[in-house]
Amino acid sequence: MDRRIYGIETEFGLTHSAPEGPALSADDAARRLFAPVLAWGRASNVFLPNGGRLYLDVGSHPEYATAEAATLHDVVAQDAAGERIVDELRSRLQESLDAEGVRGTVHLFKNNVDSAGNAFGSHENYMIARSTEFSRLLGHLLPFLVTRQILVGAGKVHPSGPPAFGAFAPGDGAASYSFSQRADHIWEGSSSATTRSRPMINTRDEPHADAQHYRRLHVITGDSNMSQTTTALKIGATDLLLRMIEAGQILPDRTLADPASALRQVSHDLTGTARLALADGSSRTALELQHEVLEAVTRFVQRHGAHHDRVPWVLELWERGLRAVAEQNASLVDRELDWAVKKKLLDAYAASHGMDLSHPRLAQLDLAYHDTSPTHGLFHMLERRGAVESFVSPQDVSRAVGQAPETRARLRGRFVAAAHAADVNHTVDWVHLKLNGPHSQRISMCKDPFATTQPDVEEMIRDLAAGAV
């Protein structure tokens, strides 16, 4: 495809910590967090003027889904904007509790596992051509997804070692560090379920666009990333592989014998050299599989050209990330890739305090890395110190908080803003815009995710502004 729509859905962890008194339950904290959302949108599931969706997911997890983005720059900016929007709700709740004299601190975490072992996700969405043979795409994509965590994993401390396969309890071995948070909680390669079986790819066919032309690839195996550059590499590298598959490029069959088991193997092997069993009886390492894809993608780009100006950046960081693992030199990427940024921070703290990874303080710092608070979060502390790289500017993120990208999201965002300004009841989803007037209803279907204008929607927006609804 010459153009693609991207989106990221992020579930956040929420907790109220009150060492000197009773803490709010998860349900109470979530209910109070979303009180301003309910007041604004009359529901806890709303679309915002920037085109994104904000809602409470299963288990009292705040979730933000970015607006449809058509560029790597925009999807990274929208993801960062979502974190800022949800953290603003956290800040408002903290102020409210402080004013009421309720002791304690509200924490919002952009991570994937809580202290009880419950997992929550970060889902990536890629629009693909309906004509793409889906089974072929899955065959090439799964080995890539299993092994890309050596680049884009968020990193995780295991104070008592890795958990046993299929177990929620901590391990009973030596303390260790893994590439991925999510890997220990994925059970199969692909499925139409997301919560029961936790697959790597959700195969339920919900395109949120013209189903004759498009399909939505829903990837749910990735970690939530604090680093913008890690997010950009995650989306950018996956997009390049998809382009190559869609173009009919012939790739070797690297079907894994057991993708879920391989996912764990890769996560807990920081050398990238564990042998992964393939379905044909042979084996490959994560480094070998990633190098194979990178080399094929590089040749593809050389033949067909780069489809956006950040492709060289993606390829360079991809290669450097693999070199960092191969050479066991995380300093090559400890400003750009989450697992390496976090590891550098933890290693320095442990060395200066005479600790190892089994110490509870290291697990606390692991969690604090993902705290979204600009003042308390460790990643944001590194950001303020200039210790990590960015992919978009703070101004880009601020703009994305209130403004939709140049896609269908721009139409939706303008419609939502106009309906709220006119105080007119309305219903919105990814495709439909509906005015629920006192005497009549008007509905528009926006099936083209790239369209920034549509006559019937423009008419509704004009009528809302004129008070003619």
Curated annotation (Swiss-Prot):
Protein name: Pup--protein ligase
Function: Catalyzes the covalent attachment of the prokaryotic ubiquitin-like protein modifier Pup to the proteasomal substrate proteins, thereby targeting them for proteasomal degradation. This tagging system is termed pupylation. The ligation reaction involves the side-chain carboxylate of the C-terminal glutamate of Pup and the side-chain amino group of a substrate lysine.
Entry EC no(s): 6.3.1.19
Organism superkingdom: Bacteria
Further information: The reaction mechanism probably proceeds via the activation of Pup by phosphorylation of its C-terminal glutamate, which is then subject to nucleophilic attack by the substrate lysine, resulting in an isopeptide bond and the release of phosphate as a good leaving group.
Active site: 57 (proton acceptor)
NCBIfam families: pupylate_PafA
Catalyzed reactions per annotation: ATP + [prokaryotic ubiquitin-like protein]-L-glutamate + [protein]-L-lysine = ADP + phosphate + N(6)-([prokaryotic ubiquitin-like protein]-gamma-L-glutamyl)-[protein]-L-lysine
Main enzyme class: ligase
Keywords carried by this UniProt record: ATP-binding, Ligase, Magnesium, Metal-binding, Nucleotide-binding, Ubl conjugation pathway
Residues where ATP binds: 53, 66, 430
A molecular-function term among this protein's GO annotations: ubiquitin-like protein transferase activity
HAMAP family: Pup_ligase
Positions contributing to Mg(2+) binding: 9, 55, 63
Lineage: Bacteria, Bacillati, Actinomycetota, Actinomycetes, Micrococcales
Statement: the UniProt record of this protein carries the keyword Ribosomal protein: no
Family classification: Belongs to the Pup ligase/Pup deamidase family. Pup-conjugating enzyme subfamily.
Pathway(s) where this gene product acts: Protein degradation; proteasomal Pup-dependent pathway; Protein modification; protein pupylation
Biological process per Gene Ontology, one example term: proteasomal protein catabolic process
